Swiss-Prot record:
Gene3D superfamilies noted in UniProt: Beta Polymerase, domain 2, cca-adding enzyme, domain 2
Family statement drawn from the similarity comment of this UniProt entry: Belongs to the tRNA nucleotidyltransferase/poly(A) polymerase family. Bacterial CCA-adding enzyme type 1 subfamily.
Species annotation: Cupriavidus pinatubonensis (strain JMP 134 / LMG 1197)
Cofactor: how bound: Magnesium is required for nucleotidyltransferase activity. Nickel for phosphatase activity.
EC number: 2.7.7.72, 3.1.3.-, 3.1.4.-
Gene Ontology MF terms in the entry: ATP binding; CCA tRNA nucleotidyltransferase activity; cyclic-nucleotide phosphodiesterase activity; magnesium ion binding; phosphatase activity; tRNA binding
Name assigned to this protein: Multifunctional CCA protein
Domain remarks: Comprises two domains: an N-terminal domain containing the nucleotidyltransferase activity and a C-terminal HD domain associated with both phosphodiesterase and phosphatase activities.
InterPro entries xref list: CCA_bact, HD/PDEase_dom, HD_domain, NT_sf, PolA_pol_head_dom, PolyA_RNA-bd, tRNA_CCA-adding_enzyme
Keyword Magnesium appears in the UniProt entry: yes
Binding site for CTP: 8, 11, 91, 143, 146
Note: A single active site specifically recognizes both ATP and CTP and is responsible for their addition.
Length: 415
């Protein structure tokens, strides 16, 4: 049997980028051969084995045949007569359909095996499908979009965009399970330029099917004095790229993505103003989270940011009482980490505008100082002192927090 490293490891080597892991394909072997060599079987859908020493995954070379819609609708053939080229031709993109032989020590040996022009497309910075079999797996649309967020100087070949459009028109993306859609979107959000992912999804029409709430933001105007970029979709893309450049978590980037969804449903006669869009954004993002089964931490932060980002932006004008109410609405005293993340999303929102990319965000330091002051109030001691009149506990705790925040704001003003 012959072992080859395939896919991303070869692509990244040619690009001079580190590769986190390798995919291995074994040609000319049966499952019995693999087990006899000490490999442990782990694959459910097709034969995959763990190396006895490194525990890396090795898959038998295989071909695929489409049997139903969706990404699970495949039958696999994994016999010793399947060649390396048979295996490579089923892969998504030419840049992922290259291989190199691997010796007994796990080292890459020999030339790059490139039957489909992957090196040519790497040089041209282009994503191109290997064959029409690309159309059999709708996850590949999401993967191409995600790769665009990682390799953001690449473009999608026109014929590949056209094929992706045909897949969308045929309803293939509608058959994707929500968990897989979220998984790919989440991975793309964590890349260097997540906006590129959504640009590619729009380009082929997939965004309108997967996230219509986001897709409808393009073409919706905002006030040019606040948003020189005007277009709401453009603004949101600037915000998520800013959040990525800040090195934020997935929850922050998702909150940045969905914070303005309500602007897509603003009545035309009030444009470019968007009064009440915060409430509409919360309703829409909750629908998105339910549909895609978004994790609770991402959903909860997104709700806080969508509902309160306008107040957080205006908080430099707020006194102690208004700031304390804001902290309490955000549950900042019980969840200070989430509140700090909300401030990061709001900072990205402010800087994600044409001409404002390098702005500072003094609201963040002021609100964190206010939170520190409010947290210094001993609510337990107040409750103990009012044990005979518990109805006043919440009011007195709130008053004490306002006083503490007021004192801290005066200190900041003096400095």
């Amino acid at each position: 049997m012959q072992v080859y490293a395939v896919g991303g490891a070869i692509r990244d080597e040619l690009l001079g980028k580190p590769s986190q892991d390798r995919d291995y394909v074994v040609v000319g072997a049966t499952p019995a051969d693999m087990e006899a060599a000490g490999y442990k079987p782990v694959g459910k859908d097709f034969p995959v084995f763990l190396h006895p020493r490194t525990k890396e995954e090795y898959a038998l070379a295989r071909t695929e045949r489409k049997t139903a819609m969706g990404y699970k609708g495949f039958a696999f053939y994994c016999e010793p007569d399947v060649t390396l080229d048979d295996d490579l031709v089923r892969r998504d993109l030419t840049i992922n359909a290259m291989a190199r032989a691997v010796d007994d020590d796990g080292k890459l040996v020999g030339p790059v095996i490139d039957p489909h022009g992957g090196q040519r497309d790497l040089a041209a910075r282009q994503f191109r499908h290997v064959s029409e079999a690309f159309a059999e797996d709708p996850v590949r649309i999401l993967r191409v979009a995600r790769f665009a967020a990682r390799f953001h100087d690449f473009t999608v070949a026109p014929e590949t965009v056209a094929l992706m459009r045909r897949m969308v028109d045929a309803g293939e993306v509608d058959a994707l399970v929500p968990e897989r859609v979220w998984q790919e979107l989440a991975r793309g959000l964590m890349e260097a330029r997540p906006a590129r992912m959504f640009e590619v999804l729009r380009q082929c029409g997939a965004l309108a099917r997967l996230l219509p709430e986001l897709d409808r933001l393009w073409g919706v105007p905002q006030r040019a004095d606040y948003h020189p970029e005007v277009d709401t979709g453009v603004h949101v893309m600037m915000v998520i790229d800013c959040a990525a450049a800040m090195g934020t978590t997935l929850a922050v980037r998702f909150a940045a993505l969905v914070h303005d969804l309500g602007k897509g449903t603003t009545p035309e006669h009030v444009l470019p103003r968007h009064l009440g869009h915060e409430t509409r954004s919360v309703e829409l993002l909750e629908d998105v989270c339910k549909r895609l089964r978004v994790p609770n931490d991402c959903r909860d932060l997104a709700v806080v940011v969508a509902r309160e980002h306008g107040n957080i932006h205006r908080s430099m004008e707020f006194g102690a009482a208004a700031i304390t109410r804001l902290l309490e609405r955000c549950d900042a005293l019980r969840k200070p980490g989430r509140f700090a993340d909300a401030l990061l999303a709001c900072e990205a929102d402010k800087r994600g505008r044409k001409g404002f990319e390098s702005d500072t965000y003094p609201q963040k330091a002021r609100l964190l100082a206010a939170l520190d002051a409010a947290a210094s109030v001993d609510a337990g001691a107040i409750a103990k002192a009012l044990a005979d009149d518990v109805s006043k506990i919440r009011e007195r705790v709130h008053e004490a927090r306002v006083a503490a925040v007021d004192a801290r704001l005066k200190q900041l003003a003096d400095h």
